[in-house]
Regions:
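Short, Lys/Arg-enriched N-terminal segments with co-localized hydrophobic residues
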Residues: 1-11
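Beta1-alpha1 glycine-rich phosphate/pyrophosphate-binding loop at the start
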Residues: 13-83, 163-207
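A glycine- and small-aliphatic-rich helix-loop capping segment at beta-alpha/alpha-beta transitions
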Residues: 36, 130, 177, 212-213
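A Rossmann-like FAD-binding core segment of flavoenzymes
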Residues: 40, 79-91, 99, 179-250
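Short, conserved loop/turn and helix-capping segments at secondary-structure boundaries
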Residues: 63, 67, 134-137, 172, ...
């Protein structure tokens, strides 16, 4: 009597994910979870740390430190069977299906590009030179230092978004964080606080609003004495003023 053993041949599919923030990490972990042993997943990112970007708005006020909102991504990826490559992706050859990095080349069957947005600081003259951006670790720390200097000689503050911005939620959060911080520093009465936004109305958020959003925000603006301008862009930023698309100078 003969015994036959059938060996299943596993054809490994390789997916390379470029970028290791929310989209990249989620894609890599989900593809591996669903593909199991038949799917090799490689995540390539130039940073070894995962940064919880939404919490950057707390950094300028010392309510969080960078170590509180970041962790090494390799450990969690390795635990789930995803290979992590700490490298910078330089180019993609779609003909040969190869991602070229500063640490070597990586062949793929499937490719996920999740490198995130690039902020356009050239959207208006002076934005790069005279404004602050809280959306990066370096920017958040520079803003912390700027606020410390601001306390010595307080004056008007303009917070908001430029034309073509698409996600306003964090900016509103930051606005109210600043207002609270000013009160905590006992300098609120010395500061005219402005909110400028390309939104059609307060609380649009880039998603066509939410129930009662406009009503609540109008109430908050009045309650906290925050001046606001909607449906405006930034024409220019100078050392001591913001020129709106309407011509108004703040």
């Amino acid at each position: 009597r003969s015994n036959f053993i059938l060996l299943k041949s596993i054809i490994m599919t390789t997916t390379v994910v470029v970028g290791g923030s929310f989209a990249g990490m989620t894609a890599a972990l989900e593809i591996k979870r669903k593909g199991k042993d038949e799917h090799k997943v490689i995540l390539i990112d130039k940073s070894p740390l995962f940064l919880f970007i939404p919490s950057l708005i707390w950094i300028p006020f010392k309510r969080r430190e960078m170590k509180d909102i970041s962790f090494k991504k390799e450990g969690i990826l390795k635990e789930k069977g995803v290979d992590f490559v700490h490298a910078e992706a330089l180019s993609v050859d779609t003909e040969t299906q190869i991602v070229k990095t500063d640490k070597g080349d990586f062949k793929y069957d499937n490719l996920v590009v999740a490198t995130g947005p690039k902020v356009n600081f050239d959207v208006a003259p002076g934005v790069a030179e005279f404004s602050h951006y809280v959306g990066t670790p370096n920017g958040a720390m520079k803003l912390r230092a700027a606020l410390e200097e601001f306390k010595k000689n307080p004056g008007p503050i303009v917070i908001g978004a430029t034309q073509n911005a698409g996600c306003m939620g964090a900016a509103y959060e930051f606005l109210f964080n600043v207002e609270k911080w000013l009160r905590e520093q006992n300098i609120r009465k010395k500061v005219d606080l402005y909110w400028v936004t390309p939104e059609d109305y307060l609380g649009h958020f880039g998603i066509d609003g939410m129930p009662m959003g406009e009503t609540m925000l109008k109430s908050f603006m009045k309650m906290f004495n925050i001046h606001y301008r909607t449906q405006v862009g930034i024409q220019e930023v100078t050392k001591d003023s913001v020129i709106l698309s309407t011509g108004e100078v703040l």
